[in-house]
A protein has these predicted regions:
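A general structural signal marking secondary-structure boundaries and capping sites
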Residues: 22, 26, 48-51, 90
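Basic/aromatic recognition patch in beta-strand/loop cores that engages polyanionic ligands
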Residues: 39, 46-77
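Generic recognition of well-ordered alpha-helical segments
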Residues: 13, 17, 39-42, 46
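Arg/Lys-rich, positively charged N-terminal/basic patches that mediate binding to nucleic acids
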Residues: 1-34
Length: 99
């Protein structure tokens, strides 16, 4: 089954800030971060139930090579995946779902 992806503004902002940070560390590293992030989102789109639930309705997937998680909600009845956050693992976990 094909699921639609919706990426919330918060997640886009987090990706943009992280891309800039990594680009300052090494030219091209920011692009690699974005590539790995979208690779993770694509995997989520194919296998949305693969990752465990937390807080009753959210799931999270680790981004390869970077200390980030893609936090998402799977709306099974609508065949929709909503990316809530691209979350750095050093941050307070309570911040994952804040807007």
């Amino acid at each position: 089954m094909k699921y639609t992806i919706e990426i919330r503004d918060k997640a886009i902002e987090e990706m943009d800030l992280s891309k800039e940070y990594y680009h300052e560390k090494r030219v091209g590293l920011g692009d690699e971060f974005i590539k790995e992030t979208f690779s993770t989102i694509k995997y989520i789109q194919q296998f949305p139930l693969h990752f465990h639930l937390f807080d009753k309705k959210y799931r999270q997937a680790k981004i390869d090579r970077f200390p980030f998680l893609v936090v998402y909600e799977f709306e099974e009845e609508d065949n929709n995946i909503v990316v809530i956050s691209v979350f750095h693992t050093s941050r307070n976990p309570k911040e994952k779902l804040k807007k």
